[in-house]
Regions:
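Extracytoplasmic cell-surface/polysaccharide-interacting catalytic and binding patches
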Residues: 1-63
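A broad, structure-centric signal for solvent-exposed, well-ordered loop/edge residues
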Residues: 26, 80, 127-129
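Short histidine-centered catalytic/ligand-binding loop motif
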Residues: 40-52, 119-133
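Charged/polar, solvent-exposed surface patches and flexible loops
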Residues: 55, 66, 84, 88
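Short secondary-structure junctions
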Residues: 64-71
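Acidic helix-start/capping segments at beta-turn-to-alpha-helix junctions
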Residues: 72-89
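Acidic, His- and aromatic-enriched active-site or binding-groove loops in soluble protein domains
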Residues: 89-131
Length: 134
């Protein structure tokens, strides 16, 4: 896939990209900020977002899921416009500059590195924590 998806079909195609055994690209762009405020949460450089997302899934999320069971993705990919809006409005988003190569998967950080991060919930642990374990 080259360039930002420009149609529903191309966005569906992006969502069907398999990042690992358990995860697809469509698992990661959900954003309450984007949905509530009508801001598209679509990568401008899907090929970079896919490469970063694959590493996140293969090196971190798959091993966590193999150990603890199903994971819930709370926040992952953010388009720069979504992240900037969230930062400006105090919605728990760091600045875009701090989120390149983090939540903004398709833009490189100041050192030129790509990366991806996700905020996750481990239901197994959440249940134990609720019941008093830590």
């Amino acid at each position: 896939m080259r360039g930002r998806p420009g149609s529903v079909r191309s966005l569906e195609e992006l969502g069907r990209v398999r990042l690992s055994a358990s995860f697809f690209m469509r698992d990661f762009p959900h954003s309450e900020i984007a949905e509530f405020h009508g801001i598209p949460n679509i990568p401008d450089a899907p090929e970079v977002a896919i490469a970063a997302g694959r590493k996140l899934c293969e090196l971190l999320l798959e091993p966590l899921q193999a150990t603890f069971g199903r994971l819930a993705i709370r926040s992952a990919y953010r388009a720069p416009a979504v992240n900037e809006f969230g930062n400006r409005d105090g919605l728990s988003c760091a600045s875009n500059l701090r989120n390149y190569g983090r939540h903004i998967w398709d833009l490189r950080d100041a050192a030129g590195a790509i990366g991806a991060m996700a905020t996750i919930v481990v239901p197994w642990f959440a249940d134990r924590y609720r019941d008093g374990a830590d």
